[in-house]
Swiss-Prot record:
The keyword Cell cycle does not apply. The gene is ABCG49. ATP 2 binds at residues 922-929. It comes from Oryza sativa subsp. japonica. It is found in: Membrane. Residues 212-485, 877-1129 form the ABC transporter domain. ATP 1 binds at residues 245-252. This is ABC transporter G family member 49. Belongs to the ABC transporter superfamily. ABCG family. PDR (TC 3.A.1.205) subfamily. Residues 563-775, 1202-1418 form the ABC transmembrane type-2 domain. Keywords: ATP-binding, Membrane, Nucleotide-binding, Repeat, Transmembrane, Transmembrane helix, Transport. The keyword Transport applies. The chain crosses the membrane at residues 581-601, 619-639, 656-676, 699-719, 725-745, 811-831, 1226-1246, 1254-1274, 1311-1331, 1340-1360, 1368-1388, 1396-1416, 1449-1469. One of its GO terms (cellular component) is plasma membrane.
Length: 1480
């Protein structure tokens, strides 16, 4: 009998360790393997390669071949067949049995996977075939998982029970882990400042000096803040525990502490043990899986690839050893297992597989199977939804073998039914597979809450309760608090700790209520029976004898070094393919520049004299700097991937060296292509020596230079870590390398005490290799007047006169630098902590609050006593037959969907009315956000059909943005301004001009108070996941920023997503108040509690596919919705106290539709509710009598000047508080000025210039100063502008300002900083280099530097505004820099530039910079003579004749130079008004 199964080309490593995890195996005879082999001599399984290496044929002979033909049926015959084939497998050696299994294959009726032909007649019949689980194809893996878990809700528990029963039948138990912790304290050290604790330039500078002072022994004001305070507890195997508490109470810190992942800057005391073993005695990161609340993934990888690589790196743990023990005992007992369970268990026990069946299983239970082949995406690139991203974050960690799961806020962005399903699966893993699970959730619905066994309540860094769920309400009742009947228990438990909410739950009406603090609750808990029981359990030592030796991991990595490296290679290769566009763009860019360069230097200089030699020298230097700059995009790409790398590294998926080696080796072909594309085009165009060996030697050096540049930028990125600092550090490194490289300043001209620097620059060796290769050729052997050859003369002048063999020394040195950079890269990846872990800054006031939490003064805000009283017009929004189409994604076309357009919304009809709070609900991916975007006019692509009316009149987008507010799901805010400033800024620009400043300020204060942001109004917003506000604070800020605009219509996309129950209640109270003022409020909502859901007046429910299935009133206690759906035959009735929103989503799910055989959309279309709604909408579609269409005299609420002032105010604050941008470029300018001053000490003095080389050297100085400080300013401006761009998109959609006002403010804000940078240079470098110390020349130099730095900054802003992301912007920017370099008049004087390129010289801003600098310094020196190319000339005449710089044209040159920053600023304003790269 023959079977053929699909196989991946990657073979796996099979573990053969004996006596394995979680088992107590009997003593097997040592010769058992030989007996197996002997017994199996009549039943042979061999692998024979077919015609294609992706297929493997298993040849099974002996008894397995019997019984293959014939018809017949009956269960007995099938069982006999199974036993006979299984018996044949049992005769094989253990190593073969571990990988072979029986899988069903349908013959005659089609099959999933390849099956052999023959037998069985024509009818379809299912037969078992022997397969090697290592080589299962994608279809076969999916088929196995589908058979085991066809319906997650019912089949998952059965599958786990089958696995458990199989193991129990042979006495094998899974490894279990108990986690306990005693008196754990965690504290952070903060630097204390006076006033607001903001990272301004001043505070940042003081912080650096204070840290330096501390290292030198001087004291500075530090304070300790307690995060966790004496917390103790136990989480046991087979139990799932819920962790609850308000934001900032220490939940995340506790989870990280238990997982052994606390930041090293935090001080931790106390004991944490796994099975009685302390954390430092094993590897907790490999024993437990910590699921972060932040979603960090590689945007270019698909969901399946992300999970496959995670599964591969995490390994199989003790599964292989457990499987080995199971099959041995089954053989001894004569047990035949279920084929599918056997195949699954064996497949997930195979180490190092490229594609894992565990991935298919995790995707199934997490609901990710439908988007398995979709790229993850990010904020600027379309990908999976936010809910799917959150599930992927969870799946990525639990796909591994860890039996301890520590999960932080895994339900954010998920609807309540999806959360319930995921937690159900986790509960089953705990109860059946004996996992130990601790989960932190924000707003668990009652039915999700009921799935947990134990509850931990935290407050202010302390444990308020830790014990069984069924005793927690008794505990709080003993404290005097009772949960109301229709209140979710989780909501009650979080609110009962809050000073503002506690009183409403006081149940002892006969006693006077007093606020009970967290400390009082803790004391009551310790005195309670549950608290005493916990203390008793903790006092008992864990019995290590009952612990399984394989329960804890003692190895840091799951794979061998070779397999780690290979897996990282596969991943890097995949990402290179996905980013092929970037690599192709870079190669094309180099090719085009090679053509331009070749035609600029095009064989016009065939005299082979000293002048031509200078041109050839210039072309070689240009090639070197071009290849160095061409690598800059590598820096941006490396830094952008670091957050994901740090996550994986901290989970011990792979080490830094395994990431660094593939990043280096796989870029070698890219460097080879770059060097080839340059050399092949430019070599003969420029006219280098036409000898093949010299061509290949030049190619080799340029290849090594490009490889070294990429390696250097990766190394710099690994230490600088952020996109703000990285480009500046890279430019600084490039500057040092070029200054000591021997071209800008020849080695003989360097100060003697700095000449050693020449030998530390890789560019020096590249120049030695290239120039020696060219100028030692026979054609340069003509003897000059000085008695040496022309080739030797040019080399001597440049200090590059070395013997021929130095070429190979140079090659060896370049290889050494490449290795050095890559070793540095690997070390940087290994030792550097992820960014965001810097020292915290805190104010004196905040310190006092933190040290006395319970004394914190708190105002009792009675929400609703003050109303948002500014005048507005109540408006109804109605819409009929709204459809929305997008282009079909490529992934769907690959799967066979042939339509060009994909419909996301289908004939949606409805209306939202003033004073009525409407909920828009549906499962994840139903189209809720899409509908809001369509109604709000936020879509940037796709086709919209249908009629949308505002107050009966057709919607006009410009007018609509004035009277509406949109709270987006993603909380996008400027990171460097405070909460209060964000809200004030929104009010300034969005409230009508007639509202005076005092009223506006009062309104802002009122909104901050209502949303409970007044206590953190001075807190910096910060960057999500790095610093600043927490997730729930950002969400409340998003709501406040929109409410402060006093809108008539408010759209809110997931206003409670990411909030805990109390924060969600605060937000919804505020939203309800807004609706009660007569405004129209619409919210999409995922997982509302009963209380939040029933706060709504009307509901619009959309099913997957964008079809409406209900639109109408909720009714008292949701009675109208319940009544409607229960009237549909077959729909199950709602249970008592069940959350109506969860029930509604469950009974309208796709699976329920299939089960009932109905279409809820069709039922709704034919219902009386729909007919009533249609009549209502008809009325709303007609303008009420006596009304007129909305009209505003101006497009924006404020006049242009006011918009400009507001934007300038915000830009001022952002610049002042971004030291990573401004402080770093100030430091760079100071560093550059010092190094130029030292290297060119007094070489600009006219008395020290004797020949043309002296002039060329000082021109190189001017060129180097301008190009490097310019590039640095441009590169550092790009990430700063990119961060603000996403905020600008939101503000522009809201109609806050004209793009011109925004751009002019951003442009204007750069001027004082650029003035400061230019002045800094003039004070340090100008006198040290020795330029003429006259007022006129000083002012001209200052003016030129200022304009140059300004146009470079504005160019950086412009290039970001016309490109989709920083990587592409970097590539285009590097093209600009290199074109400037080539045609600025430095590499080749304008008189020698061919006429077909001279126009580029005249439009190049750098050419005017050099013109002004050189002319003002040396163009008036008529009385100073120098020796130039063998003749004596006045400096002024040489400047005019050789460079074409005419002093008469100085005023014109100054005007043209000033025009460039103006031009770039205008183009920037135009670009941000025209281009939008946000895909919605």
């Amino acid at each position: 009998m023959h079977t053929t199964t699909q196989a991946t080309p990657q073979k796996s490593m099979v573990m053969t360790t004996t006596n394995g995890g979680g088992v107590d195996p009997p003593q097997w005879p040592e010769e058992e393997e030989d007996e197996d082999a002997a017994a199996g001599s009549s039943c042979r399984v061999t692998a024979a390669n077919g015609h294609h290496h992706h297929h493997q044929q298993l040849v099974v002979s002996g008894e397995l071949g019997g019984g293959g033909g014939g018809g017949g049926g009956g269960r007995e015959k099938e069982d006999d067949e199974l036993k006979r084939k299984w018996a044949a497998i049992e005769r094989l050696p253990t190593a073969d049995r571990l990988r072979l299994s029986l899988l069903s294959s349908t013959r005659g009726g089609g099959s999933s996977g390849d099956v052999s032909e023959g037998g069985g007649g024509g009818a379809a019949s299912s037969e078992l075939e022997v397969v090697d689980v290592r080589w299962l194809g994608a279809a076969e893996r999916r088929a196995v998982v589908q058979r085991l878990v066809a319906d997650v809700k019912h089949d998952h528990v059965r599958m786990l029970r089958k696995q458990r029963e199989r193991m129990e039948r042979v006495g094998v138990r899974p490894a279990t882990v108990e986690v306990r912790w005693r008196d754990v304290c965690v504290e952070a050290e903060c630097q204390v400042v006076s006033g607001k604790p903001l990272p301004t330039l001043w505070n940042a500078a003081l912080s650096r000096f204070s840290l330096l002072a501390a290292k030198l022994g001087f004291s500075h004001h530090q304070s300790k803040v307690q995060i966790l305070e004496n917390v103790s507890g136990i989480i046991k195997p087979s139990r799932i525990t819920l962790l609850l508490g308000p934001p900032g109470c220490g939940k995340t810190t506790l989870l990280k502490a238990l997982a052994g992942r606390l930041n090293k800057s935090l001080k931790e005391t106390g004991e944490i043990e796994y099975n009685g073993v302390k954390l430092d005695e094993f590897v907790p990161a490999k024993t437990s899986a910590y699921v972060s609340q932040y979603d960090l993934h590689v945007a270019d990888m698909t969901v399946r690839e992300t999970l496959d690589f995670s599964a591969r790196f995490q390994g199989v743990g003790s599964r292989a050893e457990i499987m080995k023990a199971v099959i041995k005992r089954e053989k001894e007992a004569g047990i035949t297992p279920d084929p599918d369970i056997d195949a699954y268990m064996k497949a997930i026990s195979m180490e190092g597989l490229q594609r894992s069946m565990q991935t298919d299983y995790i995707m199934k239970i997490m609901g990710l199977d439908k988007c398995a082949d979709v790229k993850v995406g990010n904020a600027m690139r379309r990908g999976i939804s936010g809910g799917e991203m959150k599930r992927l974050t969870t799946g990525e960690m639990i796909v591994g073998p860890c039996k301890v799961l520590l999960m932080d806020e895994i339900s954010t962005g998920l609807d309540s039914s999806t959360t319930f399903q995921i937690v159900s699966c986790l509960q089953q893993l705990a109860h059946i597979s004996e996992y130990t699970i601790l989960v932190s959730l924000l707003q668990p619905a009652p039915e999700t809450y009921d799935l947990f066994d134990d509850i931990i309540i935290m407050g202010e860094g302390k444990v308020v309760y830790h014990g069984p769920k069924n005793l927690i309400m008794t505990f709080f009742e003993s404290c005097g608090f009772k949960c109301p009947e229709r209140k979710g228990p989780a909501d009650f438990l979080q609110e009962v700790l809050s000073k503002k909410d506690q009183q409403q739950y006081w149940s002892r009406s006969e006693q006077w209520y007093n606020f009970i603090t967290v400390d009082q609750f803790c004391d009551k808990f310790k005195a309670s029976q549950v608290g005493q029981s916990l203390a008793e359990d903790l006092s008992k030592l864990y019995e290590k004898s009952k612990a399984n030796k394989n329960a804890l991991s003692c190895s840091i990595y799951s794979l061998s070094k070779w397999h780690l490296l290979k897996a990282c290679f596969d991943r890097e290769l995949l990402l290179m393919k996905r980013n092929a566009f970037l690599h192709i763009t870079k190669a094309v860019q180099l090719g085009l520049l090679a053509i331009i360069t070749g035609t600029v230097f095009f064989r016009t200089h065939k005299n082979f004299d000293i002048v031509s030699a200078n041109y050839y020298m210039g072309s070689l230097f240009y090639a070197l700097i071009l290849l160095m700059v061409n690598g800059i995009p590598e820096l941006v790409m490396s830094i952008s991937r670091l957050p994901v790398f740090y996550k994986h590294r901290d989970h011990y998926l792979y080490p830094g060296w395994a990431y660094a080696i593939p990043a280096f080796i796989l870029k070698i072909p890219a460097s080879l292509v770059a060097a080839l594309s340059w050399t092949s085009i430019s070599y003969y165009l420029i006219g280098y020596t036409p000898e093949a060996p010299r061509y290949f030697r030049q190619l080799l050096v340029l290849f090594l230079v490009h490889t070294g540049a990429l390696s250097l930028y990766r190394c710099v990125g690994s230490y600088c870590q952020t996109i703000a600092v990285g480009p500046i550090a890279a430019t600084m490194s490039l500057l040092v390398i070029l200054l000591f490289g021997g071209f800008l300043i020849p080695r003989p001209s360097m100060p003697n005490w700095l000449k050693w620097g020449f030998w530390l620059s890789p560019l020096s060796y590249a120049e030695i290799g290239l120039t020696g290769n060219e100028f030692l050729a026979p054609r340069w052997l003509k003897i000059t007047i000085s008695g040496v050859t022309i080739g030797r003369r040019i080399l001597i002048d440049r200090g590059l006169d070395f013997s021929v063999y130095f070429y190979w020394i140079s090659v060896a040195a370049l290889i050494g630098f490449i290795l050095l950079y890559n070793i540095g890269f690997a070390i940087g990846l290994t030792i550097k902590q992820s960014p965001g872990a810097s020292q915290a800054i805190i104010s004196n006031d905040k310190i006092r609050i933190c040290h006395g939490r319970d004394q914190e003064k708190s105002k009792d805000i009675k929400i609703g006593t003050r109303r948002m009283a500014l005048p507005f017009t109540p408006l109804t929004i109605s819409f009929q037959d709204v459809n929305y189409y997008v282009d079909t994604p490529p992934e769907m076309r690959k799967k066979g969907y042939m339509g060009r357009k994909l419909q996301l919304l289908r004939n949606i009809t409805g209306a939202f009315q003033p004073g009525i709070l409407s909920a828009l609900m549906g499962v994840t991916g139903a189209g809720k956000t899409t509908l809001l975007d369509v109604l709000a006019g936020r879509k940037t692509g796709g086709v919209i059909e249908g009629d949308i009316r505002i107050g009966g009149y057709p919607k006009v987008q410009q007018t609509f943005s004035r009277i509406s507010g949109y709270c987006e799901q993603n909380d996008v805010h400027s990171p460097q301004i405070t909460v209060g400033e964000s809200v004030a800024y929104s009010a300034w620009l969005r409230l009508p001009a007639e509202i005076d400043t005092k009223t506006r300020k009062e309104f802002v204060d009122e909104v901050l108070e209502i949303i409970e942001l007044d206590e953190i109004r001075d807190a910096l917003v910060g960057t999500p996941g790095v610093n600043g506000l927490s997730r729930e604070q950002r969400k409340r800020l998003t709501i406040a920023v929109e409410l402060v605009s006093n809108p008539s219509i408010v759209f809110m996309d997931e206003p409670t997503s990411g909030l805990d129950a109390r924060a969600a209640a605060i937000a919804m109270r505020a939203v309800k108040n807004v609706a009660e003022t007569g405004r129209t409020v619409v919210c999409t909502i995922h997982q509302p509690s009963i209380e939040i859901f029933e706060a709504f007046d009307e509901l619009m429910l959309i099913k997957r596919g964008g079809e409406l299935i209900y639109a109408g009133p909720l009714g008292q206690h949701s009675c109208k919705v319940i009544q409607y759906f229960q009237s549909i035959p077959g729909v199950p009735k709602i249970k008592d106290n069940y959350n109506p929103s969860t029930w509604m989503l469950e009974v309208t799910s796709t699976s329920m539709e299939a089960q009932l055989g109905v279409d809820f959309a069709q039922i709704y279309t034919g219902s009386s509710i729909r007919k009533d709604k249609d009549e209502l909408i008809k009325g709303f579609s007609m303008p009420p009598p006596g009304t007129s269409d909305l009209h505003f005299p101006t497009r924006f609420p404020q006049k242009f000047l006011e918009q400009f002032k507001a934007c300038l105010w915000k830009q001022f604050l952002s610049h002042w508080r971004t030291p990573s941008y401004n402080l770093v470029r100030i430091v760079f300018m100071a560093f550059s000025s010092i190094i130029f001053g030292v290297l060119y000490w007094q070489q600009g003095n006219i008395r020290h210039i004797n020949d043309q080389q002296g002039l060329f050297t000082i021109l190189g100085c001017m060129y180097g100063i301008t190009i490097f400080t310019g590039i640095n300013n441009s590169q550092s401006a790009m990430p700063f502008v990119a961060v603000e761009r996403s905020v600008m998109y939101r503000e522009r959609f809201a109609g806050m300002y004209s793009p011109w006002a925004y751009s002019f403010a951003q442009v204007a804000m750069e001027i004082p900083y650029v003035l400061m940078l230019a002045l800094l240079f003039m004070l340090i470098a100008y006198p040290t280099i020795g330029y003429a110390w006259t007022a006129a020349k000083f002012c001209w130099f200052f003016y030129t530097m200022f304009c140059t730095l300004l146009y470079f900054v504005y160019f950086g802003m412009l290039i970001v505004s016309i490109t989709p992301n920083l990587q592409v912007a970097s590539i285009y920017a590097s093209s600009f820099y290199m074109t400037q370099h080539l045609l600025s008049g430095f590499v080749m004087p304008p008189s020698q530039i061919p006429k077909w390129w001279i126009w580029l010289y005249y439009i190049s801003p750098m050419s005017w910079t050099l013109n002004l600098l050189f002319t003002t310094q040396f163009g008036f020196e008529d009385n100073s003579n120098i020796l130039v190319f063998g003749e004596t000339k006045p400096i002024a005449a040489f400047v005019r004749d050789y460079f074409g710089f005419h002093r008469e044209l100085l005023p014109l040159s100054a005007i043209i130079l000033a025009a460039y920053p103006v031009l770039f600023a205008i183009l920037y304003g135009y670009s941000i008004s025209r281009f939008n790269f946000q895909k919605r």
